[in-house]
């Protein structure tokens, strides 16, 4: 029986472990975590076969290692991996949100017959910890795989086959492309959202109306500022070059719009907003792009026949109108697989009550 070792068993690691444990009986699922309570909880809910107290021993008996730890910790583990007497053709992957630094270990690890296929499952939840793990967390989510060396083709193919039961949508790309694109669509938006929140906080003492008015669209467009600060500190530092370059682009755009406003150049200001609207409106509806200011509700459901109709039937039976409905494929920053839009906050609140048996977020 082959051994899969999870290093880090929070929401992401726990959900992957839960999925593999459910779908495979020919693997022994081991887990190591610096928080021993996570391991005990994982054993109690049956998503792992064995908890590991001795990391070194576990690494040397593993056939596959999945590092589901913050980026900085993963980098440390990878830098020390060649110190151990690992099995031949060991496959190693991770779940981090930045790839350049992690993938820099690929060539050196290959010399020791260790095959690094870096991974980024773009799924998540506002809840953390292994007790919130869900085996269906990755359904319809994009799962990015990154490797450069042709010698790792076989390992990448094996890993995709192993993870097929997650029902994720796999994309293979290069580390630099991954970090640049995620810098645009994820990392910089997190920074901008936090800047907007700081702007609000800096003035709320003298302008108490801010808190009342911010409960609407402002709260929606800055939702991602509530993400885990430790994780985003690591991501920001590990994607430093791309983030700094993109922030410089934003500075140039801010300077440009400042000048247009100062000059009262109404045609160019109009074009500024129209071009943004036109580009955003043509983005694929099912792909998570810009943040909606509608009264959206996210429902965490497995991708099974009849689930969407079950949800909509419950809502309609309570005389609540739905104005839009979409299945999300990229879910790293959106909590839930199904996004439902309502015409009022009251309708959304009533839907939450009607869907009390489901995990709902907004």
Curated annotation (Swiss-Prot):
**InterPro entries from the xrefs?**
6-PGluconate_DH-like_C_sf, ACT-like_dom_sf, ACT_dom, NAD(P)-bd_dom_sf, PDH_C, PDH_N, Preph/Arog_dehydrog, Prephen_DH
Q: Which PROSITE patterns does the UniProt entry name for this protein?
A: ACT, PDH_ADH
Q: Does the keyword DNA repair apply?
A: no
Q: The Prephenate/arogenate dehydrogenase domain covers which part of the protein?
A: 2-291
The UniProt catalytic activity note for this protein reads: prephenate + NAD(+) = 3-(4-hydroxyphenyl)pyruvate + CO2 + NADH
A GO MF label: prephenate dehydrogenase (NADP+) activity
UniProt GO BP? tyrosine biosynthetic process
The positions annotated for binding NAD(+) are 3-33
ACT domain segment(s): 296-362
Tell me the protein family, please.
Belongs to the prephenate/arogenate dehydrogenase family.
Name of the protein in its database record: Prephenate dehydrogenase
Gene name of this polypeptide: tyrA
């Amino acid at each position: 029986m082959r051994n899969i070792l999870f290093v880090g068993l929070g929401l992401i690691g726990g959900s992957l472990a839960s999925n593999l444990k459910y779908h495979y009986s020919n693997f022994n699922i081991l887990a190591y975590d610096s928080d021993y309570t996570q391991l005990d909880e994982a054993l109690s809910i049956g998503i792992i076969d064995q908890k590991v107290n001795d990391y070194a021993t576990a690494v040397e008996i593993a056939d596959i290692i999945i590092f589901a730890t913050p980026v900085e910790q993963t980098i440390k583990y990878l830098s020390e991996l060649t110190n151990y007497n690992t099995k031949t053709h060991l496959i190693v992957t991770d779940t981090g949100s930045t790839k350049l630094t992690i993938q820099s270990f690929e060539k050196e690890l290959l010399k020791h017959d260790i095959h690094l296929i870096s991974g980024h499952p773009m799924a998540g939840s506002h809840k953390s910890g292994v007790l919130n793990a869900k085996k269906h967390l990755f359904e319809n989510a994009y799962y990015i795989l990154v490797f450069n060396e042709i010698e790792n083709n076989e390992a990448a193919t094996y890993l995709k086959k192993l993870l097929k039961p997650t029902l994720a949508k796999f994309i293979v790309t290069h580390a630099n492309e991954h970090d640049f694109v995620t810098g645009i669509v994820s990392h910089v938006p997190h920074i901008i959202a936090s800047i907007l929140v700081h702007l609000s906080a800096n003035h709320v003492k003298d302008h108490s109306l801010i808190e009342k008015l911010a409960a609407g669209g402002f709260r929606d467009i800055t939702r991602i500022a509530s993400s885990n600060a430790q994780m985003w500190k690591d991501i920001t530092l590990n994607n430093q070059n791309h983030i700094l370059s993109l922030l410089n682009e934003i500075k140039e755009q801010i300077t440009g719009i400042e000048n247009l406003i100062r000059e009262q150049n109404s045609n160019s200001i109009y074009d500024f907003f129209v071009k943004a609207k036109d580009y955003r409106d043509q983005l694929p509806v099912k792909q998570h792009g810009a943040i909606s200011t509608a009264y959206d509700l996210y429902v965490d459901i497995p991708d099974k026949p009849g689930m969407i109709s079950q949800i909509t039937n419950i809502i309609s039976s309570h005389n609540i109108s739905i104005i839009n409905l979409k299945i999300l494929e990229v879910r790293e920053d959106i909590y839930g697989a199904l996004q439902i839009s309502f015409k009022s906050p009251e309708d959304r609140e009533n839907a939450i009550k009607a869907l009390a048996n489901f995990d709902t977020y907004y």
